[in-house]
Amino acid sequence: DDISNFPVIETRMEGQNLKYFSALINVDKVDGFTLSGNGKVDGNGERYWKSFWLRRRVIPKCTNMDELRPRLLHISHSNNVQVSDVRLVNSPFWTTHIYKCDSVKLLNLHIFSPSFPIKAPSTDAIDIDACKNVLVKGCYMSVNDDAIALKGGKGPWADQDPDNGGNCDIIIEDCTFGFCHGVLTCGSESIYNHNIILRRCNLDQAKRLLWLKMRPDTPQQYKYILVEDIKGNVRNCIFIAPWTQFYDLKDRKDMLVSYSSYITMRNIHLDCDSFFAVEKSKQYKLSNFCFDNLTITAKKDVKIDENIIDALVMRKVEINKVN
């Protein structure tokens, strides 16, 4: 748990290529890499978590990277990768980060970091960063941040930087999600996500099922996302709002407009606090959403504001308000 044991290398963090600390396990340009077995990789993150929250008390605007800490597993520029049957726990920072990879299978993993009594900050279970053809199957995830986060770059010129990129052809299926901030999250450093499927999953105590972080300083397109066959309980079913943390337009003068379109949610049976937590904004446009065969109980936000989404289609949507 001593950061001085981790070398500073050229790596990828928070939507930018830079010098930062290596992960505990680092894989770069290794096609066919496999990590498997019934063992456990324990990041021993408690000391880092305590230090992070102490720093945040003294310097409230400190960034996630200001508290120097390593990730658990980082795989980059590698194809035909498989990680299976491993327990990845107590990461100091992001747990599993894949960058610029093609054909990745993450199978039957158990990924955990605590939300109590010490919150493990920024311990995303799986960060998919400018990748394609990724399968996440049969995994259990419970972390004090997002479970599946789709990343790819941030900033007003992010879509013109060759180090960045979109995520496409991603399947997450047959997984169980415990506590997490978002089951499937687009952002916050993300530019283009398309052909994304989340299906046949169970939720228990997650904060959000689908979270679209609309960053006003980054051009973003989230399209062709399918969420289907979901059961359990969640605080918010669909959550869309501007994400302004560390907002920086740099030298760009025009207002960026982002887009989320062709989003389908179907065959979903959930108990939640809020169903439709969608904020209207001039900085993004929402269109071609489809809600199909939904059975929801919710404490609030049971009314779907059809003025927020262009070309919204609803079929067999049952939302019952409960106290």
Where is each model-derived feature located?
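Extracellular/periplasmic carbohydrate-active domains that bind, remodel
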Residues: 1-323
